[in-house]
UniProtKB/Swiss-Prot annotation:
UniProt-annotated location(s): Cytoplasm
Annotated family: Belongs to the class I-like SAM-binding methyltransferase superfamily. rRNA adenine N(6)-methyltransferase family. RsmA subfamily.
Function: Specifically dimethylates two adjacent adenosines (A1518 and A1519) in the loop of a conserved hairpin near the 3'-end of 16S rRNA in the 30S particle. May play a critical role in biogenesis of 30S subunits.
SMART domains on file: rADc
Protein name, per record: Ribosomal RNA small subunit methyltransferase A
């Protein structure tokens, strides 16, 4: 069988550690589950998913890997789609579970694509850059707290499961990875979710600035004063000082009283 060659421009670091693959699969009940895998690479993790899941659909952008995967998994409960997940139309109706080892350079884009389609998924397990994992689970008033933290925690109950070292991949990345679990919330409103993402993105547009100096880019002084008076904010408060519940209330206040 032809040996896959990792492509640097696609950010390919193929998982090769059996213990890590087993650990990922052990963290979720895959029985009768239909799985979406984003970028199955050599099919290393795919093999473990197929052992337990009902069906696996894999989005793989690298066309050179397709014949290798098709030969490796012939007659398996697997559908391989040679397409960029970021461009894919997600037309399925029943909720799926996503499990993936994501390329570092497009992690945020893929996350926000998933978040924009939150109604189509129930659980997500992702291998990401360790630094990104820390941002996903970050708490207010910490250096890693960001719009990604808010979006992730608005959409789901999130948990950083474990760190994965460079030796678990080929080729070895220069940094650690981590596996993060998302248990998606079931009571979300699509319109309010979209509004929340938009509003928090605006609030974190310039992270080094105060909240006021972020809001001034899309609100006038009177509107900001109305917000500050209602929430009794200090003038110098910064975006990273406010928790998720406050941002939910802020977004609701903006769209109900100002927008």
């Amino acid at each position: 069988m032809q040996k896959p060659v990792p492509k640097k421009h696609l950010g390919q670091n193929f998982l090769k550690d059996r213990k890590i693959a087993e650990k990922i699969v052990e963290n979720i009940d895959l029985k009768n589950k239909e799985i979406i895998e984003i970028g199955c690479g050599t099919g290393f993790l795919t093999n473990f998913l197929l052992e337990k899941a009902k069906f696996v659909t894999c989005y793989e952008i690298d066309r050179n890997l397709i014949p290798i995967l098709e030969k490796k998994f012939k007659n398996k409960n697997l559908r391989i789609i040679n397409e960029d997940f970021l461009l894919a139309e997600l037309e399925f109706k029943e909720k799926k579970t996503i499990i993936a080892n994501l390329p570092y350079y497009i992690t945020s884009k893929i996350l926000f694509k998933i978040f924009a389609n939150f109604e189509k998924f129930d659980k997500i397990i992702l291998m990401v850059q360790n630094e990104v994992a820390d941002r996903i689970v970050a708490k207010p008033k910490t250096p890693t707290y960001s719009k990604l933290s808010l979006a992730s925690q608005y959409i789901a109950h999130v948990k950083k499961l474990f760190v994965v070292g460079p030796d678990s991949f080929f080729p070895k990345p220069k940094i650690n990875s981590a596996v993060v679990f998302f248990d998606l919330r079931t009571n979300l409103d699509a319109k309010k979710t979209e509004q929340f993402f938009w509003f928090t993105k605006k609030c974190f547009q310039f992270k080094r600035k105060t909240l006021y100096n972020n809001l001034i880019f899309f609100l006038n002084k009177q509107q900001i004063e109305k917000i500050y008076n209602f929430f009794q904010f200090a003038q110098n408060i910064r975006p990273q000082q406010l928790d998720l519940v406050t941002y939910i209330r802020l977004a609701d206040f903006y769209f109900n009283n100002i927008f």
